[in-house]
């Protein structure tokens, strides 16, 4: 953001007086962020140049508790083109901003509503980043969220593995520990091996991200971030599922956290780019048809 935006936004954020939601996904457009119904056209009001926004957003997590929404809208160009999308910081109390249906999910309840924009006006100063280059702002956001998700999923996966090992050593059906059975050992060996390899890749990628500018990350590390993300999110689902199996009935119950871990982390295989999108990103770098 600009120096003026930093002065306006950062202090109240640090004081807990301001929060932002992320408005990229639309009801008719999920993974393909370059197609969107939301548009913004130039309009001057009371001598102040700005933009009039119309459209819709979905999965705007955090509403109604946040004060602003990072709203991505097409300002020029054709659908399917990355160029021509702009990010606007829109106050949630702006006339024409309407919170609609709240979406219940597998794990997280009701703070994911639809939003409708009807002639919502914002000044030019509400543009975050460069005009027509809003997807670069979105990329910065999702790269950081993807590596965060990967670390979170790895930690939860390791917990599930550790608890399954502990229980398998303690539980003694038919007079001997579950742990002596290779049907228990081998799946946990594979899960632990994957966890160890992922840990190194996540640490390496996160350290490299810290040493680069955000544009450099997008250019040089995007594929590594995607590798971390989709593999870790798959791992935690597999680890939680097997931990349930090792624990039997009590593992499936809410007296153990495995079902909650599964429900919570299963969404990570869809949010911040579905795992198929992550794999497509890796393939693009691998085969040289995507930067």
Each language-model region and where it sits:
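A short core secondary-structure module
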Residues: 49-99
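A short, Trp-centered hydrophobic/proline-enriched beta-strand micro-motif
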Residues: 16-24
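N-terminal glycine-rich flavin-associated loop
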Residues: 1-4, 30
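Long, acidic (Asp/Glu-rich), low-complexity accessory segments flanking structured domains
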Residues: 119-137
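A structural signal for short hydrophobic beta-strand segments in well-ordered beta-sheet cores
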Residues: 38-42
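Active-site-adjacent elements of ketosynthase-type condensing enzymes
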Residues: 28-37
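Flexible, small-/acidic-enriched active-site or ligand-binding loops
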Residues: 35, 93-123
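Alpha-helical interface subdomain recognition
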Residues: 3-5, 12, 16-17, 46, ...
């Amino acid at each position: 953001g600009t120096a003026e935006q930093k002065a306006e936004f950062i202090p109240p954020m640090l004081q807990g007086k301001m929060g932002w939601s992320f408005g990229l996904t639309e009801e008719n457009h999920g993974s393909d962020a370059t197609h969107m119904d939301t548009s913004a056209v130039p309009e001057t009001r009371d001598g102040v140049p700005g933009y009039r926004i119309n459209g819709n957003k979905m999965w705007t997590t955090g509403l109604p508790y946040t004060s602003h929404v990072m709203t991505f809208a097409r300002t020029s160009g054709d659908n399917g083109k990355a160029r021509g999308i702009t990010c606007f910081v829109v106050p949630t109390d702006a006339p024409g901003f309407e919170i609609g249906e709240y979406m219940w999910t597998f794990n997280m309840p009701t703070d994911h509503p639809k939003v409708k924009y009807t002639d919502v006006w914002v000044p030019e100063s509400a543009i975050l980043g460069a005009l027509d280059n809003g997807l670069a702002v979105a990329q910065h956001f999702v790269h950081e969220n993807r590596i965060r998700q990967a670390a979170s999923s790895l930690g939860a996966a390791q917990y599930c593995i550790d608890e399954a090992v502990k229980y398998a050593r303690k539980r003694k059906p038919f007079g001997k520990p579950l742990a002596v059975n290779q049907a228990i050992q081998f799946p946990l060996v594979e899960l632990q091996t994957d966890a160890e390899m992922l840990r190194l890749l996540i640490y390496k990628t996160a350290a490299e991200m810290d040493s680069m500018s955000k544009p450099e990350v997008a250019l040089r590390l995007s594929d590594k971030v995607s590798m971390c993300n989709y593999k870790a999110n798959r791992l935690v689902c597999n680890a939680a599922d097997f931990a349930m199996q090792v624990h039997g009935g009590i593992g499936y119950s809410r007296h153990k956290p495995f079902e909650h871990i599964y429900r919570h982390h299963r969404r990570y295989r869809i949010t911040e780019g579905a795992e198929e999108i992550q794999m497509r990103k890796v393939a693009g770098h691998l085969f040289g048809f995507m930067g």
